[in-house]
A protein has these predicted regions:
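Short edge beta-strands and adjacent turn/loop segments
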Residues: 2-22
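Detector for Asparagine
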Residues: 11-13, 43, 80
Length: 80
């Protein structure tokens, strides 16, 4: 799985990290499982900046995960 990350810095400090994960899925269960996996990984990132992960297929966004700086748990949404 490849991914592309983009960081937004102010005065050398990371404020927001956006990660796009392009992937091809073959069913809803794969989207759910992969989203859960990435959700768990995000909990290991520092909480000092906003982080968003967009999991997308060729045609559409499959799921979205977002955690605001300082929050303990990310928010996620899986699109139908």
């Amino acid at each position: 799985v490849g991914y592309v990350g983009e960081g937004f810095y102010i005065n050398g400090n990371l404020q927001q990290l956006t990660i796009k994960v392009p992937i091809e899925f073959y069913g809803e269960a794969e989207v759910i499982g992969f989203t859960q996996y990435v959700y768990g990984i995000i909990n290991g990132f520092p909480k000092s900046y906003d982080i968003e992960v967009v999991i997308e297929s060729r045609d559409q966004i499959e799921s979205f995960i977002y955690r605001e700086a300082g929050d303990d748990e990310p928010y996620f949404h899986i699109f139908n």
